[in-house]
Amino acid sequence: MRIADYSVTRAVLDRHGFTFKKSFGQNFLTDTNILQKIVDTAEIDRSVNVIEIGPGIGALTEFLAENAAEVMAFEIDDRLIPILADTLRDFDNVQVINQDILKSDLQSQIKQFKNPDLPLKVVANLPYYITTPILMHLIESKIPFQEFVVMMQREVADRISAEPNTKAYGSLSIAVQYYMTAKVAFIVPKTVFVPAPNVDSAILKMVRRPEPLIEVTDEDFFFRVAKVGFIHRRKTLWNNLTSHFGKTEEIKTKLTQALELADIKPSIRGEALTIPQYGKLADALKEVGF
């Protein structure tokens, strides 16, 4: 029997008198086939360390611990710590850290692995309400995660992996794909969770690029420009640029110069620009004095 078997999950929750907290976005997976598929997608073996976020009662952790060198699981809910000590008691390669991953000193934490030099992967069922902040925190942390295989709301997975000229494409697609490739591996129906969420989930596989997709003069400014492109999705890039930077004649002259330098038509919509085009635009805007 597995932790994720519905009867075991129910028994664990009842034994510990656990009640779900909506504020933590808790939905526990009760399908062992899907858990195995997650581990297979992440290609977990004894040559890698794994960071898990939000282990819940340890359903995914059990599968990870059986396959990885070591697992470090971050759990924010104090009430789950004694439950995890119970469900994972047979494993000596799991560390449960009772901390908010967003407030954790990850550089120090990963030194606590027995072999911290092994490749590092993130495998997690992320809380819906805080998926994007967690992902961006990890991606921007400068820790050399090899890849992420994470479950999230299907709509968010579609946005992260979206291509230009699609409804889902936006500044989040650009922010992630600048650092990583992103592809939806498979869909997880809402019916396999306790309690069932309102929408289906997706497993997103993200692999870190050896270098960012493009080279830009100023990364922060590049991400700012990418956000500007999507201020009003149905309006032109020119409208969005003037909405953000201003509409004085001097500013409009500079914007025209930058668009010419970047070889981008002002009438294009932000959702049609590729990441390299946003990079060219950001560098051109810098060059003309923004």
From Swiss-Prot:
Entry EC no(s): 2.1.1.182
Keyword Electron transport: no
Localization: Cytoplasm
Pfam families membership: RrnaAD
Alphabetical UniProt keywords: Cytoplasm, Methyltransferase, RNA-binding, rRNA processing, S-adenosyl-L-methionine, Transferase
The keyword 4Fe-4S appears for this protein: no
Domain of life: Bacteria
Binding site residues for S-adenosyl-L-methionine: 27, 29, 54, 75, 100, 125
GO terms for cellular component: cytosol
Catalysed reactions listed for this entry: adenosine(1518)/adenosine(1519) in 16S rRNA + 4 S-adenosyl-L-methionine = N(6)-dimethyladenosine(1518)/N(6)-dimethyladenosine(1519) in 16S rRNA + 4 S-adenosyl-L-homocysteine + 4 H(+)
Molecular function GO terms recorded: 16S rRNA (adenine(1518)-N(6)/adenine(1519)-N(6))-dimethyltransferase activity; RNA binding
PANTHER family associated with the record: DIMETHYLADENOSINE TRANSFERASE, DIMETHYLADENOSINE TRANSFERASE-RELATED
NCBIfam families: ksgA (TIGR00755)
Function, as annotated: Specifically dimethylates two adjacent adenosines (A1518 and A1519) in the loop of a conserved hairpin near the 3'-end of 16S rRNA in the 30S particle. May play a critical role in biogenesis of 30S subunits.
Family classification: Belongs to the class I-like SAM-binding methyltransferase superfamily. rRNA adenine N(6)-methyltransferase family. RsmA subfamily.
Protein name: Ribosomal RNA small subunit methyltransferase A
Source organism (scientific name): Streptococcus uberis (strain ATCC BAA-854 / 0140J)
